[in-house]
């Protein structure tokens, strides 16, 4: 029996497949969009599908790494169509799954989590625009995630928060 699961799949760019965040509509391709959704939305959805059967019925927490750019209401910059859309779809999947998890498990909480900019291969091409104090180590990121999960109101089915514990709008 598992009481906490953290789903960390995701990608923003893939040099081998020549996939990069789109800056304009003309940059869109069906192949890139399909890859974004396969990795950022479908894979976590399949994890949610299988985890519901093995999670602790009295204390289940599932967090999916999402991104603030997956917030529909917070999108003021545009661009990054595939990544944004796939993360927005992930957030809807988490929100929808939280309803079923609550029905099937006595105490379940699902979370879409924006970790900030983490010093990994995902963010490498974009780090030059990030202030040093806003570029987090994987260790710090993991500790913040666990800390924020422990502080959440378990009576609320689903949360979308960032590394500071602030609510991110859907």
Q: Which role does the model predict for each range below?
A:
Residues 46-54, 97, 107-108, 151:
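A structural motif corresponding to the C-terminal end of an alpha-helix
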Residues 112, 120, 124-170:
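C-terminal helical subdomain
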């Amino acid at each position: 029996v598992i009481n906490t699961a953290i789903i960390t799949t995701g990608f923003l760019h893939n040099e081998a497949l020549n996939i990069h965040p789109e800056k304009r509509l003309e940059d869109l391709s069906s192949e890139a969009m399909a890859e974004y959704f396969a990795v950022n939305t479908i894979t976590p959805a399949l994890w949610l599908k299988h985890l519901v059967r093995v999670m602790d019925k009295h204390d289940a927490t599932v967090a999916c790494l999402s991104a603030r750019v997956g917030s529909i209401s917070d999108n003021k910059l545009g661009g990054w169509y595939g990544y944004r859309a796939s993360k927005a779809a992930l957030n809807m999947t988490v929100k929808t799954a939280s309803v079923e998890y609550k029905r099937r498990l006595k105490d379940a909480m699902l979370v879409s989590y924006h970790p900030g900019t983490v010093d990994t291969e995902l963010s490498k091409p974009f780090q030059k625009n990030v202030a040093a104090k806003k570029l987090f180590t994987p260790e710090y990121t993991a500790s913040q995630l666990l800390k924020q999960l422990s502080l959440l109101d378990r009576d609320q089915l689903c949360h979308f928060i960032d590394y500071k514990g602030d609510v991110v709008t859907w």
